[in-house]
């Protein structure tokens, strides 16, 4: 066989494999996804950059495509928390917890992560509002559902934001210890630090 023909054939086959693989990845990434996932991811990116209004519109769009989309519901709750609309955030989180409790399948680790993150975030809201005993109960509930999901963030988060972030377990323990002290000796709120509490999203 002619070496030039063999080389041309090999190059064409290589290109065909690359195009087919790329097309498959593109299809899987954009077209073969559950309804609402794309808009939820866009909302999450905007939420992380502090663009709360646009983030909320993407989360709402995701919920139009897929009512009860757990990522979009959590995203809405986080927007409410970041904009200090705590009552609305509690309603969103209570709905999410109730819906997941009724519909979560046992073999869904991401769903368990969301079910743990919801009471952890509710605990943050209650903590900021001074309802420390209720906050502690929500932190404990989050730890019971899935401690790994609400534990210390990853390496990149530590480098970019905080090398020693507080965890749900740390905060629950701290509240418990403070509530054992006489009321005039308790230190349960430091507004500047409380405002920096890390929201949980699996």
Q: For each predicted feature, which ranges?
A:
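TPR alpha-solenoid repeat register
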Residues: 72, 106, 118, 151-152, ...
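Terminal, low-structured helical/coil segments at or just beyond the last alpha-helical repeat
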Residues: 3-7, 13, 17, 143-202
